[in-house]
């Protein structure tokens, strides 16, 4: 995921550099209408809603609609998306105990996870509670396991090169805890994951935001989640 402010700055710079020497006129034809429809949905944004921090980011592909609800609730529906991540939680993150519940129905690749970032070092982390057709741990390096909250989580690390982050395009490490028995509600004791990661030399930095997120990648689906 990437910060919304960085995207706005990048888009402004791209627009300035790409301005044509001579003005062009285009008609709003069927092709333009089709392209607009493919990119329909909720724009990227962050902020506070009903006492919870929310973050929603999309690469603009496909159709994804994110809606904040009462309290810690949100819903998201997506169809043929590129990539998006959205949810509600806190800013800054911490080793808190999180309770959540709801529904998560991906058709294809998607994750339901506690998701957050730290800086110094720049770390993107996931505690995955459920996923669709792709186990995100399969692309990483297995580091160990942690037993907590009635289940076993496999721990992985991965490196993202020149990828979007909360600090712009950077190379950074991802930390993953992936639950072996999927669920869509319960308690997540973040202190247990952070301590397990630390014992494996996987250190975190200064916490940025931390949300219970739904992520979709080249897929369709729906989710309705409440954070307590």
From Swiss-Prot:
Q: Which key words are in the record? A: Carbohydrate metabolism, Glycoprotein, Glycosidase, Hydrolase, Polysaccharide degradation, Secreted, Signal, Xylan degradation
Activity versus pH: the note is: Optimum pH is 6.0. Stable in the pH range from 4.0 to 8.0.
Tell me how temperature affects activity: Optimum temperature is 60 degrees Celsius. Around 53 percent activity is retained at 70 degrees Celsius. Stable from 30 to 60 degrees Celsius with maximum stability at 30 degrees Celsius.
The protein depicted here goes by the name Endo-1,4-beta-xylanase xynf11a
Q: Which residues are the active-site ones?
A: 124 (nucleophile), 215 (proton donor)
Q: Where in the cell is it found?
A: Secreted
A single GO molecular function, which one?
Answer: endo-1,4-beta-xylanase activity
Q: Which gene encodes it?
A: xlnA
């Amino acid at each position: 995921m990437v910060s919304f402010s960085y995207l706005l700055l990048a888009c402004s710079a791209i627009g300035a550099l790409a301005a044509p020497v001579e003005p062009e006129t285009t008609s709003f034809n069927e092709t333009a209408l089709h392209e607009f429809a493919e990119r329909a949905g909720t724009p990227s944004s962050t902020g506070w809603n009903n006492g919870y921090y929310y973050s929603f980011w999309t690469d603009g592909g496909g159709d994804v609609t994110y809606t904040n609800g009462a309290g810690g609730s949100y819903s998201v529906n997506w169809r043929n998306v590129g990539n998006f991540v959205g949810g509600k939680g806190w800013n800054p993150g911490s080793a808190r105990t999180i309770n959540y519940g709801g529904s998560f129905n991906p058709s294809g690749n998607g994750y339901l996870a506690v998701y957050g970032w730290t800086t110094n070092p720049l770390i993107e982390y996931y505690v995955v509670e459920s996923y669709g057709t792709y186990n995100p741990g399969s692309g990483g390096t297995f580091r160990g396991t942690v037993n907590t909250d009635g289940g076993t989580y496999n721990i992985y690390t991965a490196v993202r090169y020149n990828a979007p982050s909360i600090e712009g395009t950077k190379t950074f490490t991802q930390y993953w805890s992936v639950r072996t028995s999927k669920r869509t509600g319960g308690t997540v004791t973040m202190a247990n994951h952070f301590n397990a990661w630390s014992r494996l030399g996987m250190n975190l930095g200064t916490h940025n935001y931390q949300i219970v997120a739904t992520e979709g990648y080249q897929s369709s689906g729906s989710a309705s989640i409440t954070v307590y």
